[in-house]
Amino acid sequence: MTARVSIVIPTFNRARLVTRAIDHALAQSVPVEVIVCDHGSTDDTPEVAARYGERIRYLRREQDRGPIVCWRDGVEHTTGDFIHINYDDDWVDVCFVERALQLFADDVGFVYTRARIHVPGDAEATVMLRHPGGIRPMSQLVQFLLREKLPISPGCALFRRRDALKNLLPEIPGAKGVYGKNSGVGEDLLLFLLTSLDYPRYAHVPEPLAHFLAHPSSITTSAGSSGRMNELVDAYAVARAYYRQQPGSTAQATGLAGWLAKTQWKRAGRRAG
């Protein structure tokens, strides 16, 4: 039986950008369900969505209750076995879903790809997540996620629907500040970390099939420009602390063991290109 895949596009006041996300979702080389979840947009987003007719499912809520509520609303309305959360300012290559599905197995928790960061005005995009490709031990990726200040984005990953519903938390206990409740900062990291508890392996496609747009209103760029990067990093530290409280969680390797793990990871990534 062919796996069913749903692409969820949460959006808020980005009518100008969301069309690219929708167009690339609809152009996938395998059939997908596309759900656009709009919480409280006051721009032309409803009109933009209407142009696609029955090719997409448009969920409209009049109240904006924050990113994480919008993400979950979209995921809860999917019918696929697998889901991809595609932020409204990002997009994926037409082969993204097909290539990710090829690496899924019963013991693989999720699949993610490399990504390109596009800065308006820059001729060449930066490739990120140069990690070793293929199916690999989950413990390797967990060490990376515990070590790095900023996480892998769900925008370059494919998850099982049941895992997304279980592990995309409405909020993180202890989270506070501007990146606390309902911001999605930390919840995105925990989607990976909590899912890792149930699977021995993950998979990585060593091709940049996801595309992220760096612009003033994107969360990472705005954190840097507003002097709140430390608060952003702290929010992810709270998420890691929550993960470490869970049964079966992995402690971060430190000292010589941590240095060796990091070195081996980087070498494998360089060999992969």
Report residues per predicted region.
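Acidic helix N-cap motif at the loop->helix transition within catalytic regions
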Residues: 16-19, 43-51, 91, 95
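Short aromatic/hydrophobic "clamp" motif used to bind/position activated sugar donors
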Residues: 83
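A conserved acidic beta->alpha catalytic loop
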Residues: 24, 38-47, 63, 87
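Short, acidic, metal-binding catalytic loop of nucleotide-sugar glycosyltransferases
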Residues: 23-32
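Conserved donor NDP-sugar-binding/catalytic core segment of glycosyltransferases
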Residues: 95-128
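Conserved nucleotide-sugar donor-binding catalytic segment
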Residues: 135-225
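Glycine-rich, basic loop-to-helix element that forms the pyrophosphate-binding segment
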Residues: 61-78
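N-proximal low-complexity "stem/linker" segments adjacent to membrane-targeting elements
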Residues: 1-24
